Design a protein with these regions (language model features):
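Bacterial N-terminal signal peptides that target proteins for export
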Residues: 1-10
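Bacterial N-terminal signal peptides
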Residues: 9-18
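Immediate post-signal peptide segment of exported/extracytoplasmic ligand-binding proteins
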Residues: 20-33, 54-62, 136
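N-terminal glycine-rich cofactor-binding segment that shapes the pocket for flavin-like pterin cofactors
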Residues: 28, 62, 69, 73, ...
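Extracytoplasmic "Venus flytrap"
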Residues: 31-48, 68-73
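Short, polar/charged alpha-helical segment
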Residues: 39-64, 126
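Contiguous mixed-secondary-structure segments that line small-molecule binding/active-site clefts
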Residues: 50-51, 79-82, 87-88, 92-157
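Short helix-initiation/N-cap motifs at beta->coil->alpha
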Residues: 65-79, 148
Length: 157
C-alpha cells in the first residue's frame, strides 16, 4: 500500500512537471533591428526573411523587423545584440571592427573588388566562413553576408 502511494505521488509530480504539448505554445519571437528604410534592398530583404520564417515554421517563429533605427540607433545595435535585447541585425561590416574583429574593416576599403562576382567569391567561400567564425568568441553568430552596395567617391571639379 505504501509503495503504491509513493508510486502514485511520483507519477503525479512527474506529470505536473511535464509540459502539455496539446496546449498552444507561444511563437518564438526574433527581434530584427536595422538602420535603413523599409524600401531599401536591406529593408526589403529583412521583411522577406520575416515573412518566410513565419511561413516555413507555420507561425512557430515570428520575426519582428525594426527598420530606420526605431529600436536602436546604429551605434547601439551591436551592444543590444550582445546583451540579447535583439536577436538579429543587418549591420554594415564596419560595426565588427570595434567588436575586436578588425578583418571586417577590409570591406570598407574602396576599389578592393572589381565586381560582385569577386566579392561573392570571397564572402561566400572559405574566407567568408572564416571571418564569420571570428565573431563567435564575441558572442555573435554570423549567418551570412548581405550585399550593401559598393562605396562611391565623388568630387566637385
Amino acid at each position: 500500500m505504501r509503495l503504491a502511494k509513493l508510486f502514485f505521488g511520483l507519477a503525479a509530480c512527474t506529470l505536473a512537471a511535464t509540459p502539455f504539448t496539446a496546449v498552444a505554445q507561444q511563437p518564438i519571437v526574433i527581434k530584427f533591428s536595422h538602420v535603413v528604410a523599409h524600401d531599401t534592398p536591406k529593408g526589403l530583404a529583412a521583411e522577406y526573411f520575416a515573412k518566410r520564417a513565419g511561413e516555413l515554421t507555420k507561425g512557430k517563429v515570428k520575426v519582428e523587423v525594426y527598420a530606420n533605427s526605431t529600436l536602436y540607433k546604429d551605434k547601439e545595435e551591436m551592444e543590444a545584440l550582445q546583451l540579447g535585447a535583439v536577436q538579429m541585425l543587418a549591420p554594415s561590416l564596419a560595426k565588427f571592427g570595434p567588436l575586436g574583429v578588425k578583418e571586417f574593416e577590409l570591406f570598407d576599403l574602396p576599389y578592393i573588388f572589381d565586381n560582385y562576382e569577386e566579392l561573392h567569391k570571397v564572402t561566400q567561400g572559405p574566407v567568408g566562413q572564416s571571418l564569420l567564425k571570428k565573431l563567435e568568441p564575441k558572442g555573435v553568430v554570423g549567418l551570412a553576408f548581405w550585399d550593401n552596395g559598393f562605396k562611391s567617391f565623388s568630387a566637385n571639379t
